From Swiss-Prot:
Keywords of the record: Cell membrane, Cytokine, Disulfide bond, Glycoprotein, Lipoprotein, Membrane, Myristate, Phosphoprotein, Secreted, Signal-anchor, Transmembrane, Transmembrane helix
Disulfide bridge map: 146-177
Protein's GO biological process: extrinsic apoptotic signaling pathway via death domain receptors; immune response; necroptotic signaling pathway; negative regulation of protein-containing complex disassembly; positive regulation of apoptotic process; positive regulation of canonical NF-kappaB signal transduction; positive regulation of extrinsic apoptotic signaling pathway; positive regulation of JUN kinase activity
Positions bearing Phosphoserine: 2
Family annotation (Pfam families): TNF
Source organism of the structure: Marmota monax (Woodchuck)
Purpose: Cytokine that binds to TNFRSF1A/TNFR1 and TNFRSF1B/TNFBR. It is mainly secreted by macrophages and can induce cell death of certain tumor cell lines. It is potent pyrogen causing fever by direct action or by stimulation of interleukin-1 secretion and is implicated in the induction of cachexia, Under certain conditions it can stimulate cell proliferation and induce cell differentiation. Induces insulin resistance in adipocytes via inhibition of insulin-induced IRS1 tyrosine phosphorylation and insulin-induced glucose uptake. The TNF intracellular domain (ICD) form induces IL12 production in dendritic cells.
Subcellular location: Cell membrane
Lipid attachment points (N6-myristoyl lysine): 19
Protein known as: Tumor necrosis factor
Family as reported in the entry's similarity comment: Belongs to the tumor necrosis factor family.
Length: 233
């Protein structure tokens, strides 16, 4: 019931009172009726304000949305997110430690994987779909002394479907030895790691390779030191 209809009912009730009621007793009745009318109007106004500003009313939906998820609902949400992530192409290959002549990548070793369309063909990772990819690689070089000036390079290259030229995506050059070696430096061992990583937009069928210029210096003493990977974002 609206405030206007409440006030209209009160006015009709006042008009229905007999004229003789306006005596000494009628005055008290009129006062009570006026007080009742005031309280009724004030209550209706307060109720209207509370409903208008949303203090009370249909807040059940908002309340339900703020309720914490049950363990079953949380598990379903995490499982759905995990399935979406598991559908993306991913590759992580490791180096063959028996070959010192060239850097050969293997996918069937511990901690290596090819998933969701990624392939390793002719020592290159083949991209299965268009999109953004994180491309990364690490190598570790090891040597004994500096009989001569040594330059070590590590490069990640792309053979695109749109053009067959080899293009370097990532590249780094390091030297473990200064140009002028100190006396006795030729007897000291040295280690030189190189890490490369970046995000690139690749196309289906693109081939990626990771190479070094001096594979004979690679250190395979520990697993996880030389690797190459691609992850779809």
């Amino acid at each position: 019931m609206s405030t206007e209809s409440m006030i209209r009912d009160v006015e009709l009730a006042e008009e229905a009172l007999p004229k003789e009621a306006w005596g000494p007793q009628g005055s008290s009745r009129c006062l009570c009726l006026s007080l009742f009318s005031f309280l009724l109007v004030a209550g209706a106004t307060t109720l209207f304000c509370l409903l208008h500003f949303g203090v009370i009313g249909p807040q059940r939906e908002e309340f339900l949305n703020n309720l914490p998820l049950s363990p079953q609902a949380q598990m379903l949400t995490l499982r759905s997110s995990s399935q979406n992530m598991n559908d993306k192409p991913v590759a992580h290959v490791v180096a063959k430690n028996e070959d010192k002549e060239q850097l050969v990548w293997l996918s069937r070793r511990a901690n290596a994987l090819l998933a969701n369309g990624m392939e390793l063909i002719d020592n290159q990772l083949v991209v299965p779909a268009n999109g953004l990819y994180l491309v990364y690689s690490q190598v570790l070089f090891k040597g004994q002394g500096c009989p001569s000036y040594v330059l070590l390079t590590h490069t990640v290259s792309r053979f695109a479907v749109s053009y067959q030229d080899k293009v370097n995506l990532l590249s780094a050059i390091k030297s473990p030895c200064p140009k002028e070696s100190l006396e006795g430096a030729e007897f000291k061992p040295w280690y030189e790691p190189i890490y490369l990583g970046g995000v690139f937009e690749l196309q289906k069928g693109d081939r990626l390779s990771a190479e070094v210029n001096l594979p004979s210096y690679l250190d395979f003493a520990e697993s996880g030191q030389v690797y190459f990977g691609v992850i779809a974002l």
